[in-house]
Amino acid sequence: MAGERWRAEGLGEGWAIYVTPRAPIREGRRRLATQNGDGSDAPAYETHPSRHGRREVRFSEEPPEVYGDFEPRAAKERSPGERRTPPEKFRSDSAKEEVRESAYNLRSRQRRQRGPQEAEEMKTRRSTRLEQHSQQAQQQLSPATSGRGLRDAQSLSEDRGEDEPSSQPVTSQTVSKKTVRTPETSVMSEDPISNLCRPPLRSPRPDASIVQHINPFEEGETEDDLESSYSDVTIRIRSRDSVESRDEAAVAAGHHPDSLWGLPHSRGDFTAHENQPSLLPTGCQKNPQEWVEQAVRMRTRMAYNNIQKSDFGNQSPSTSRQQAAVQPPDESSVKIKWWLLILVAALAMGIYWFFHTPVVETTAVQEFQNQMKQLQSKYQSQDEKLWKRGTTFLEKHLNSSLPRPQPAILLLTAAQDAAEVLKCLSEQIADAYSSFRSVRAIRIDGAGKAAQDSDLVKHEVDQELTDGFRNGQNAAVVHRFESLPAGSTLIFYKYCDHENAAFKDVALVLTVLLEEQTLEASLGLKEIEEKVRDFLKVKFTSSDTANSYNHMDPDKLNGLWSRISHLVLPVQPENALKAGSCL
């Protein structure tokens, strides 16, 4: 009758099949192939012209309804007061075997509520079987009896299945032994539930997970079939450091039907990673509560093993990132050390270059100071200003950095009574300045060139100074500067200029002998400077002097004076000095 449902209890597992009748197909149209999901070669039912068309069972999309196979129509229809007739009553033996072989197990209906008396009897039978089974398990000492333990556990589960469905968590159901062990059969004979189930998403958690696949046995299977079905227990452990391809392969093998052919289904087959001990013999002998406790212990042990494995080589990504984060500082520290080494070397070279020349010059200054002290001890009649100002002026020039900004020009003057002292002291001061180089200062006598041509004297003076300075001499003394031809003195623009002097690291000592007989010691340096200036102006610009007008003028003289008058110091006569010899 349309709209009515019937239930067939079969397979001894409490499974029920819901089917929905379909309206008859019109006459003369060939019925489609069976939709039993097993892909068998059974001929499709056809509508005979002499009788009404049979109703066809199709897949229903409603959750409570299940896609059943073809059964006699009398099995589907029943009266409201009649008892439901199991569908197996109308099947032939071959049809029953075919249904069993096709693993046509779909969604199960809810368990029917059992009465208190029936539940008590089931508990009594279960406890009795558990005690018997535990006694038999104690006698199993060798691994060779694992097959027997599997069969005992299978028989225990079979008896329990008659009373109530198995309470163990079943994640997926596989096909029977004949379906699994025959790769040559058609793909359509695979488990329809596996075809309809959506593969679960990959768990993002890195903890190890245990996936168990247990084949529920069916009625009528042989002992080998039960043993083979119970041997399909696989435990897969996915850790954080597992290879991604291996992880995906493990997930695909657990949830896709194509992986059924790749799984080994031999007796006692048990796959476990991380060298976990075999759990099958003891697991089949435990009740559901012990199964849960064992699963918890497994997860704890595998998590600990993953931690140890991460510590001893297969480090986690976080540890790798930390090491990668620590490694760049090591490389940077090496680079910093190299840069520090280069910096220290450059600093050492700079210090050496900076102090090398000053050390040399300091030695030259010390040598000059020693020479000046000796002269001071010899010429005791000289004014203190001469030693103090003269020594400081020349020391400052020696200590100045290279290249020096300008040459050192020292002008010494004296009266007629100190002419010999002026000549000796000027030469000795110039030699003291160049004493570090152990060379003798350049000497030019102006009195011997007084009668010569101005241009010729100019050329000779220029030649002597240039050759001497280029040959390493750094000091020169010009005696009787006032006796040189007026025009020839213009060459000293070249050597005494403040900014554009030809040689700046040299010292020139000029002497001017006044016409006065005695130079008073009470005169100050400013007065002595004015006296020397007036005297040179008279000598170089007087109209009585031949050719002086054509070669020198007051403007040129003022420019020359500004260049040679850096420091003007007086020289006093010495009583100990003998004629013709220096102290």
Curated annotation (Swiss-Prot):
Region called Disordered, residue ranges: 23-208
Regions of this protein lying in the Nuclear compartment: 1-339
Entry-annotated residues carrying Phosphoserine: 60, 134, 142, 155, 157, 189, 228, 231, 242, 316
Residues in compartment: Perinuclear space: 361-583
Location(s) in or outside the cell: Nucleus inner membrane
Transport recorded as keyword: no
Signal peptide stretch: none
GO terms of molecular function: ATPase activator activity; ATPase binding; cytoskeletal protein binding; lamin binding
Record's compositionally biased regions (Basic and acidic residues): 70-101, 115-132
Composition bias, Polar residues: 166-188
Residue numbers spanned by region Interaction with TOR1A: 356-583
TM region(s), chain numbering: 340-360
Glycosylation site residues: 399
Cross-link Glycyl lysine isopeptide (Lys-Gly) (interchain with G-Cter in SUMO2) residue location(s): 309
Keywords: Coiled coil, Glycoprotein, Isopeptide bond, Membrane, Nucleus, Phosphoprotein, Transmembrane, Transmembrane helix, Ubl conjugation
InterPro entries per record: LAP1C-like_C_sf (IPR038599), TOIP1/2 (IPR008662), TOIP1/2_C (IPR046753), TOIP1/2_N (IPR046754)
A single GO BP: protein localization to nucleus
Family statement: Belongs to the TOR1AIP family.
Summary of the function given for this chain in its UniProt record: Required for nuclear membrane integrity. Induces TOR1A and TOR1B ATPase activity and is required for their location on the nuclear membrane. Binds to A- and B-type lamins. Possible role in membrane attachment and assembly of the nuclear lamina.
Protein name: Torsin-1A-interacting protein 1
Organism: Rattus norvegicus
